[in-house]
């Protein structure tokens, strides 16, 4: 949910990924 990893946005609809 950080927003820095767009590849994770497929499971985080807030548009970010966990780092």
Swiss-Prot record:
Primary location class: secreted
Domain of life, source organism: Eukaryota
GO biological process, one term: innate immune response
Compartments in which it is found: Secreted
Modifications the protein undergoes after translation, according to the UniProt entry: Conversion of fibrinogen to fibrin is triggered by thrombin, which cleaves fibrinopeptides A and B from alpha and beta chains, and thus exposes the N-terminal polymerization sites responsible for the formation of the soft clot. The soft clot is converted into the hard clot by factor XIIIA which catalyzes the epsilon-(gamma-glutamyl)lysine cross-linking between gamma chains (stronger) and between alpha chains (weaker) of different monomers.
A single GO cellular-component term on record: extracellular region
Keywords: Adaptive immunity, Blood coagulation, Coiled coil, Disulfide bond, Hemostasis, Immunity, Innate immunity, Secreted
Domain notes: A long coiled coil structure formed by 3 polypeptide chains connects the central nodule to the C-terminal domains (distal nodules). The long C-terminal ends of the alpha chains fold back, contributing a fourth strand to the coiled coil structure.
Described function: Cleaved by the protease thrombin to yield monomers which, together with fibrinogen beta (FGB) and fibrinogen gamma (FGG), polymerize to form an insoluble fibrin matrix. Fibrin has a major function in hemostasis as one of the primary components of blood clots. In addition, functions during the early stages of wound repair to stabilize the lesion and guide cell migration during re-epithelialization. Was originally thought to be essential for platelet aggregation, based on in vitro studies using anticoagulated blood.
Assembly description: Heterohexamer; disulfide linked. Contains 2 sets of 3 non-identical chains (alpha, beta and gamma). The 2 heterotrimers are in head to head conformation with the N-termini in a small central domain.
Protein's UniProt name: Fibrinogen alpha chain
